[in-house]
Amino acid sequence: MTVKTETAAGASTLTYSKMRGMVALLIAFMKQRRMGLNEFIQKIATNSSYSCKPSEVQSILNISPPQESELLNENSSPPPSHSQQINLGPSSNPHAKPSDFQFLKIIGKGSFGKVLLARHKADEKFYAVKVLQKKAILKKKEEKHIMSERNVLLKNVKHPFLVGLHFSIQTTSRLYFILDYINGGELFYHLQRERCFLEPRARFYAAEIASALGYLHSLNIVYRDLKPENILLDSQGHIVLTDFGLCKENIEPNGITSTFCGTPEYLAPEVLHKQPYDRTVDWWCLGAVLYEMLYGLPPFYSRNTAEMYDNILNKPLQLKPNITNSARNLLEGLLQKDRTKRTGAKTDFMEIKNHIFFSPIDWDDLINKKITPPFNPNVSGPSDLQHFDPEFTDEPVPNSIGQSPDSILITASIKEAAEAFMGFSYAPPMDSYL
């Protein structure tokens, strides 16, 4: 294929390979320009004393436009291979902003903000958008947990039972996680309605949860906050683990940590003792959730928190006779107060996977979602909100949530927030849009 172009020197032939060279140079130029702009903006946002001088702009952006002679050079280099292309990584790809979305309903609330159902205006896809107030996060000094949640979400793209992150964006006052929209309801909601589950249904959910936890552990991530409120059902009835704010990264197989965190009903004894703990805290929590699915309440529950803590530390596990021996054996292993003797302490997920309780599970079929879930939430589509609390869905959506400010007045608090959440923004690489 050839293309004729007219120049001052006369007609010249532009071959297909030359066109590819032009495209490669232009793409490299655009990417270089984008990186320079990002550095320039960050410098302004985090340094109020910085005065931008026209002579400095070119050096800060660090770009020079490709010349026509470069684009039409007979000996131009071939376009870079995929492995040679510049990898911008998970940072400020400008492909999403709040005003790109139509915010339809509030579907949940948390300590720092709301979760909303939103539709992307361009492709009309539905997302769950977690909107957090920077001021509230900074006030409670939780910025590290938020950034950790963002980092963990970026690693979840390969597992079917973990919620996926599509974009993370920010304005001067808010952070936005654009996530998979899951509308089958929380496991907590279904447990409240049905009180407890039959053993086959509990086994199915426990297997999918264990698979998700095992994947996180393979990435050296400890989840630390497993509870029915953080376990969603998708539209077919598969579980989806969400809310990674308490995850601890970089915990090797024999690594330990010591931060006191979690939800009272599901805290492991070693956490309550304020002792160093490892990834087996997640297997304790799995035992607590499995117990609750089978019996209707967490294993050592009391309305009095101090009494419940004492139960977790000192009271023997009591199991009613209406479960199978394999379920009993697994619960006794997972809810072992000595973490070194707990099921999962030796070979982590493999020990769970090979337990007799899960012998009916084909794990390959499970991970590929070939096993029909024992319960179908029967949602008619994305707008079906039957499994969300009307307390949330009836609340009006604030107009400000969908606004992308055109101009920014740099203040001390905005500068502090810019520094605290630097690198938060994420979009898929540009190649995925081409």
Swiss-Prot record:
GO terms for biological process: apoptotic process. The keyword Iron-sulfur does not apply. Residues 101-358 form the Protein kinase domain. One of its GO terms (molecular function) is ATP binding. GO terms for cellular component: cytoplasm; endoplasmic reticulum; nucleus. It is an enzyme of class 2 (transferase). It comes from the Eukaryota. Keywords: Apoptosis, ATP-binding, Cytoplasm, Endoplasmic reticulum, Kinase, Nucleotide-binding, Nucleus, Phosphoprotein, Serine/threonine-protein kinase, Stress response, Transferase. Belongs to the protein kinase superfamily. AGC Ser/Thr protein kinase family. This is Serine/threonine-protein kinase Sgk1-B. It comes from Xenopus laevis (African clawed frog). The gene is sgk1-b.
